[in-house]
Structures are given as structure tokens and as C-alpha cells.
Amino acid sequence: MQNMVILGATGSIGASTLSVISANPFAYSVYGLVANASVDKMLALCVAHKPKVAHMVDEAAAKQLRAVLPATLNIQVTTGMNDLLGLVTAAEVDTVMAAIVGAAGLVPTLEAVKAGKRVLLANKEALVMSGELFIEATKRSGAVLLPVDSEHNAIFQCLPQEVQANLGRCDLAASGISHILLTGSGGPFLRSDLATLAAMTPAQACKHPNWSMGPKISVDSATMMNKGLEFIEARWLFNTQAEQLKVVIHPQSVIHSMVQYRDGSVIAQMGNPDMRTPIAHCMAYPQRIHSGVEPLDFFKVGQLSFYEPDFERFPCLALAMDACAQGQEATTVLNAANEIAVEAFLQGQIGFTQIAKVNEACLVTVPKCPMGSIEDILALDAQTRVYARETLASIA
């Protein structure tokens, strides 16, 4: 029986994880649930899954949860960073699902790694912001790191065992690998006239054609910043050089990514677009369990198509690839700027195409200095957010 903590329990990844746990009740136990401020959702999860600990990042939300949670459930409600770090490093915890969206997930995810936990990584920002530190911490602690993002999980499944066992430190060329092909659907605006993009609304941006996701990642998919962040994450997970990574637009989201080998072979991972598949794979690896996902019906798939990315349509993707080439400081700046810009777009403060303008302004302007610690990373993140908000004020 694996005891699990779910960071981001009330989000879409959290819901999918709990669905897989419910399908395999004799193999997994919910030890802790972590959310920001959604009291009603957390209350329902506590009643359904009966964790030992329910942690609310928001202190007022924790107080509200304590007031409404039935005492008979005997669930400890905690708040504050110290309690959160204590939860993810607790001796009773085997596995941590790292699914808090954005930079907020970095510190608890890194602490789980340092504690040697089995970490299921759905928070791509952890590697985008702290790739080298994160990989080094994994190496020192012996933590097991497994990628949950559908694309990185697909790549992982297509790799030989010696690469799977050495994430972040592997040698792709030595294993006969020539390229990693990172697929992306192109989002809801793949076929939209370029002249119409500036007027696109948050509701339109969040209407992904294939995947059901939260608002932030949905907007990132519409700008293809999500693919850019995944490009950076893949660089650290698979120890790649830029020339070993290619982005491929694949609108049907049936092939989740591919690995191309020196001999001309290409291995692809396919399946219906449902996050329960990569989640179940990571939870059970190297075994396989029931995920609740319907198997792919090849007779209904129809045509599969592939295109090169259009960087005029997706400037955020180009910015992310450029930042990856510049290094860790640039990717940290880009991530922070994008979080502020997307939040502003969702609140109606800026237009869709202005997201890229905010990101580019921060990349060009925010001074970058060497980062040797988590404190350095968080300081640069905070500095960038200040500048991004100033940039918003000038264009809003």
C-alpha cells in the first residue's frame, strides 16, 4: 500500500489522480491532500477519501475547513509552509503527486525530492525554474522522479530502461537516440486568422479541442507557452541539447510524443487524451494498473496529421526555446512573467496577444545573475513579477 500526498488536490490533475486511486483502492491510500483556498472542494474530497491531513495554503481557508469538517473524520487540518514541508517529507509518505500549478509548487516539490520520495512530477515549473538544482537534489537523495505531463510521460515510455533509470543524467546518443519529438495540438487557435487573435477572449482560449485542463494551462496551450515550458522541462529531464529536441504540431492529440533512434526507428506512445493514463503509469511504474481510460479505438481515430510550428502564430513558443538556449536565469524570468501575464489576461486586463509582449519585455529587461540556490531563484522570480506588473500597467 502506497501512502500518497497530492499537491494541488482540487485541480484537474488532483481529480484525475484521485480517480485512479479510487480504481485501485487496495494499492494506494490518500495520506494528505493539499489545496490553496477551495474549501468546498476540499471538504468534499476529505469526506470521500478520508486523508490523515488536509492542508490549505490560505490560512483563512484552513480555518473555514476546520469549522465545517466533521470531527468524526479525525482529519488534521494544517496551514503554513512549515506544515506543508512537514507533510511532504513525513516518514509515512511514500509518493508525492506534485500538481500545484506554477512557481508555488517549486519549494514543496523540491523538498519532497530532497527527502527521497517517489515524486510524480506534474509541476513543470519546478524544472523550468530550478532544473540543475532539482536534478542534483534528485541525484543526492536517490528520489525516484517520474514525469506526469502527457508528453514527457510518453517520451519516458519510449526510452530504453537505462535512460529511464537516469533521468537528468542520461546520455541519449549513447543509447542510440537521435531526436525527441515533442508533440502539441496547437490549441484552440491553430486555424484562426492571425488578425483575430488579439480579440480572443479568456473563454475562447480555455476551450481546448482535446484536453480538459485548468484555466492557466489552457491559456498556455492556446499560446503554446505550455509547449515551450515542456521543451525546457524535456531539456532537463532527458539531458538533451537543443538540436535533439523538435516540436511537432499534431492536432489530434493521439500521439503524445515520439523518440527517434539512430537506425531510423521512431517509437511513439499513443492513447486517448486523458491524464489518468500517464498518472496511472507513474503511480504503478514499472508495473501497470487500471486507469479507467477507454482504450484507443484505431478504427475511429481517422487521419493523423503533423505540422511544423508557426512562430508568428505562437511567439511564446519561440520565446521559451530562446530562453532555454540562454539558460536557467532566462527560463526563470520567462516563467514568472508568463504567470503574471496569463493571470492578467484571465482577468480581462490585457489582450491575448499582449501575453507574449509582456513575456518578451521581461526577458529583455530583467537583469539576470547566476543562481546557486533556491533563494536566488525565488528572488529572481519575485523581481520579475514586479517588473511584469509594471509592464502591465504601461500597456493596459
From Swiss-Prot:
It comes from Shewanella baltica (strain OS155 / ATCC BAA-1091). Its EC number is 1.1.1.267. One of its GO terms (molecular function) is 1-deoxy-D-xylulose-5-phosphate reductoisomerase activity. InterPro entries: DXP_reductoisomerase (IPR003821), DXP_reductoisomerase_C (IPR013644), DXP_reductoisomerase_N (IPR013512), DXPR_C (IPR026877), DXPR_C_sf (IPR036169), NAD(P)-bd_dom_sf (IPR036291). NADPH binds at T10, G11, S12, I13, N123, E125, G214. Catalyzes the NADPH-dependent rearrangement and reduction of 1-deoxy-D-xylulose-5-phosphate (DXP) to 2-C-methyl-D-erythritol 4-phosphate (MEP). Its cofactor is Mg(2+); Mn(2+). 1-deoxy-D-xylulose 5-phosphate binds at K124, S150, E151, S185, H208, S221, N226, K227, E230. It catalyses: 2-C-methyl-D-erythritol 4-phosphate + NADP(+) = 1-deoxy-D-xylulose 5-phosphate + NADPH + H(+). Pathway: Isoprenoid biosynthesis; isopentenyl diphosphate biosynthesis via DXP pathway; isopentenyl diphosphate from 1-deoxy-D-xylulose 5-phosphate: step 1/6. Coiled coil: none annotated. This is 1-deoxy-D-xylulose 5-phosphate reductoisomerase. The lineage of its organism: Bacteria, Pseudomonadati, Pseudomonadota, Gammaproteobacteria, Alteromonadales. Mn(2+) binds at D149, E151, E230. Belongs to the DXR family. Keywords: Isoprene biosynthesis, Manganese, Metal-binding, NADP, Oxidoreductase. Pfam families: DXP_redisom_C (PF08436), DXP_reductoisom (PF02670), DXPR_C (PF13288). SUPFAM superfamilies: 1-deoxy-D-xylulose-5-phosphate reductoisomerase, C-terminal domain, Glyceraldehyde-3-phosphate dehydrogenase-like, C-terminal domain, NAD(P)-binding Rossmann-fold domains. One of its GO terms (biological process) is isopentenyl diphosphate biosynthetic process, methylerythritol 4-phosphate pathway involved in terpenoid biosynthetic process.
